[in-house]
Amino acid sequence: MTKKIKAYVKLQIKAGSANPSPPIGPALGQQGVNIIEFCKSFNAKTNKIDKDTPIPVIISVYNDRTFSFITKTPPTAFFLKQAANIKSGSDNPKNKKIGKISIFKINEIAKKKSPDMTGSTLNSISKSIIGTAKSMGLSIED
């Protein structure tokens, strides 16, 4: 018999850096999850990833207070900032460009993001990434 899901909790946590402090502690504590157990599991699963990488995680909390979780690939904006070597996006992306990114780099990012975007072609993922890049104030080079 399958367990009944009580709630889903979506968080974004730096790889290998989960600890019981906010925002993790309060979000999981409300659901009655063993926070320390989650932190140990998450850190073990993400210990091979660079420590500054934000990892989206979806935690399924069951009625018996157990949990399971899946990790996703880092956000597109994280990959774009890394590729363009910038700290943050432009405050006025339409008029103020803060960097450039090549189509080659966009295709590399699309390949990294493809496991999370099931049912999408590499071309459509690339178009989505180009839209994100433009909204951050990056110009696209051929």
Curated annotation (Swiss-Prot):
It holds the Pfam family Ribosomal_L11_N. GO terms for biological process: translation. One or more lysine residues are methylated. NCBIfam families: L11_bact. The keyword Ribosomal protein applies. One of its GO terms (cellular component) is cytosolic large ribosomal subunit. This is Large ribosomal subunit protein uL11. Keywords: Methylation, Ribonucleoprotein, Ribosomal protein, RNA-binding, rRNA-binding. Belongs to the universal ribosomal protein uL11 family. CDD domains: Ribosomal_L11 (cd00349). It comes from Wigglesworthia glossinidia brevipalpis.
